[in-house]
Curated annotation (Swiss-Prot):
InterPro entries: Cys-tRNA-ligase (IPR015803), Cys-tRNA-synt_Ia_DALR (IPR015273), Cys-tRNA/MSH_ligase (IPR024909), CysS_C (IPR056411), Rossmann-like_a/b/a_fold (IPR014729), tRNA-synt_1_cat_dom (IPR032678), tRNAsynth_Ia_anticodon-bd (IPR009080). ATP binds at residue 266. It comes from Desulfovibrio desulfuricans (strain ATCC 27774 / DSM 6949 / MB). This is Cysteine--tRNA ligase. It is an enzyme of class 6 (ligase). GO terms for biological process: cysteinyl-tRNA aminoacylation. Keywords: Aminoacyl-tRNA synthetase, ATP-binding, Cytoplasm, Ligase, Metal-binding, Nucleotide-binding, Protein biosynthesis, Zinc. Its cofactor is Zn(2+). The keyword Lyase does not apply. It catalyses: tRNA(Cys) + L-cysteine + ATP = L-cysteinyl-tRNA(Cys) + AMP + diphosphate. Its main location: cytoplasm.
Length: 483
């Protein structure tokens, strides 16, 4: 498998440091607000990466942390008159709810910063002892950036470039504007812990170094592209300065999310939480949308893009439903399928594997899935092919492949009939279509057809079309969908 390594700035063959085992650490949320679409993308990317590694037969230990003490958490607690621990727990619970809805599997280990205060202090003490960090008279501890010559190797930034934008805030006792905080001296009204430098709390960067320490060296360290600098750059410096080993062999970062071609921000009024989106769309639609673009590419969140994802899911689930029906009603004949159809079917499974092994190219993998759906639809639409025993085998293989796609991508795993009903419901809600009214018209039309009142049946079909509802008559009865 090839993975793009931010450190080497190229795709590299993935080789675990320990045969058959993978240690992977991904930076999780700072628990002060509901997760937005950027959090969803990062979570989904690394969820699929873990799934793919396990599909390859590797034993993966996946660690994803929670930052549960931070300036943003403290500020929110003070603003709302709450205990900071209550704020953190509220949004950790919300994270789990959102991720469960999106089908994101839980990490194997989920450390919290406040459970590792001793490890954080121990790491700070080692850095001070080795001259890589220093304590100030006010009780802050800073990392000496110039003490780590490779600083900037991940982001590709030079010290001169960084120095031009560095500042020392009033009251800070930094030796150098480049230095960053490992331990912050206590302030009135803030949580703090006793330490060798006086009461205080950890800086953001040191938390991840301490929480990942017992899994070193890591095979993969991941996160969003926004974490490359300064967070991951600082993690490398403070960890490698004392462990004298590589923090991680592969650094994997997912691209940014924009909303309607603009940066997502509360000030622009386009800030989209996962919960906002799932009021109007099914969770699987958001999952499909985010996996429909290569993970390193930027993605633009639009209603049009979500509508297209919805249509794509409709095609796949409709093919799955029609396949299930065909397998229960057909009488099979001993006849082969066209050689080209059989060859194309076999080739697509291999092509999907190649896409997933080429830097987790989910966009290309989904393209191969839709090629398979087209092949299945071609078979279903041809009575001769559909009734062939070889056709039955292909349809059964289609259902088996869909189960594998669900295992690897977290898609197409629901019961087709139930999913399509949920899809109709949520699309109808977006369009303010009254489903009980639709169902009443369908019932009336069914009665008209039973009474052979075809003029009335046609009038009711038109009434449904005027509502945006199409009706298809089948041997099993009426099927309806939204136009």
């Amino acid at each position: 498998m090839l993975l793009y390594n931010t450190l080497g700035r190229q795709k590299e063959e993935f080789t675990p440091l320990r045969p058959g085992k993978v240690h992977m650490y991904v930076c999780g949320i700072t628990a002060y607000d509901y997760c937005h679409i950027g959090h969803a993308r990062s979570a989904l990317v690394f969820d699929v990466l873990v799934r793919q590694l396990r599909h390859m037969g590797l034993d993966v230990t996946f660690v994803r942390n929670f930052t549960d003490v931070d300036d943003k958490i403290i500020n929110r607690a003070n603003k709302e008159g709450l205990d900071w621990r209550e704020v953190a727990q509220t949004y950790i619970n919300a994270f789990y709810e959102d991720m469960d809805r999106l089908g994101v599997q839980r990490a194997d280990v989920e450390p919290r910063a406040t459970d590792h205060i001793q490890e954080i202090q121990d790491l700070c003490a080692k850095l001070v002892a080795e001259g890589k960090a220093y304590a100030t008279t006010s009780g802050d501890v800073y990392f000496r950036v110039r003490s780590y010559p490779p600083y900037g190797k991940l982001s590709g930034r030079s010290l001169d470039e960084l120095l031009s934008g560095a500042r020392v805030a009033p009251g800070e006792e930094k030796e150098d504007p480049l230095d960053f905080a490992l331990w912050k001296a206590a302030k009135p009204g803030e949580p703090s812990w006793e330490s060798p430098w006086g009461p205080g709390r950890p800086g953001w960067h040191i938390e991840c170094s301490a929480m990942s320490e017992s899994y070193l060296p890591l095979d993969i360290h991941g996160g969003g592209q926004d974490l490359v600098f300064p967070h991951h750059e600082n993690e490398i410096a403070q960890t490698e300065a004392v462990c004298h080993c590589h923090l991680a062999r592969y650094w994997v970062h997912n691209g940014f999310v924009q909303v309607n071609a603009e940066k997502m921000s509360k000030s622009l009024g386009n800030f989209k939480t996962i919960r906002d989106i799932l009021e109007s769309y099914l969770p699987e639609t958001l999952r499909f949308f985010l996996l429909g673009k290569h993970y390193r590419s930027p993605i633009d969140f639009t209603a049009e893009g979500m509508d297209e994802a919805e249509k794509a899911l409709h095609r796949v689930y409709t093919a799955l439903l029609e396949t299930q029906k065909a397998l229960t009603r057909e009488k099979w004949k001993k006849s082969p399928l066209p050689a080209q159809l059989t060859e194309d079917w076999a080739a697509q499974a291999e092509a999907l594997d190649e896409a997933m092994n080429d830097d987790l190219n989910t966009a290309q993998a989904l393209g191969h899935i839709f090629t398979q759906v087209r092949l299945v639809n071609r078979l279903l639409e041809d009575k001769t092919l559909r009734a062939a025993e070889a056709g039955r085998d292909l349809l059964q293989d289609f259902l088996a492949r869909a189960e594998q796609w669900n295992t690897r991508l977290g898609l197409f795993g629901q019961q087709p009939e139930a999913f399509l009903a949920d899809l109709r419901r949520i699309r109808a809600a977006r369009r303010n279509i009254d489903i009980p009214r639709v169902e009443a018209l369908l019932q009336e039309r069914q009665e008209a057809r039973a009474n052979k009142d075809f003029a009335r049946s046609d009038a009711l079909r038109q009434a449904l079309l005027d509502l945006g509802v199409s009706v298809q008559d089948t041997p099993e009865g009426q099927n309806w969908d939204l136009e």
